[in-house]
Amino acid sequence: MVGKGSLNHNSREFYASNVDPNRSHLNIEFCREDIRNVYHELFDKAQERFNAKQTRNDRRVEDYYEKICSSKQEKPFHEIVLQIGNKDDTGIHTELAETAKQCLIEYANGFQARNPTLRVFWSHLHMDEATPHVHIDFVPYITGSKRSMAVSYTHLRAHE
C-alpha cells in the first residue's frame, strides 16, 4: 500500500467511520515517539559533520527533517499495516481473533530487532476495527554513506 500514513488515526486522535469507539480500549500502543526527536537522534551528528565539511553555505543542511519533508522524492516516514486473514476468518468476533492478535503482538515487538535500519517511532495494534491489525511507522536510514551525510534517510538501501 502506498500513501501517507495517518499518525492521528493510528493513535485514535480522530476516529474513522469504520472504528468502533467502544472497542478502542482494547488497542495496544507499542511505541509513540515524536518523529522530530527521532530525526535528531538519527541524523544530528552526521548533519553536523556534513555541514562542517561544506565550503558553500547553500550546501549546508539546516534541518534534515524539513529537508526530507520538502523533498519530492522522499517522505518523512513509511508505514506498514499488517493483518492476518480477513474479517471472515480472523475478524474481531471470530474464534481466531485472539490468535491473530497474539501473532501481531509478537511480530510488532520483534520488528525493530529484525529491521535495525528501520527506526520504529510509532506502532499500534488496532482491535476496534473489523480485523485485528498493526500499524508500524518507521524512518528508514543507512550508515556509512559516501555521497552525502554519513547517516542518511533512504528507503531503498535500508533493506540491504
Predicted regions, residues:
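A short beta-turn/loop motif at secondary-structure boundaries
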Residues: 124-131
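Active-site-flanking beta-strand signature of metal-NTP-handling nucleotidyl enzymes
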Residues: 77-87
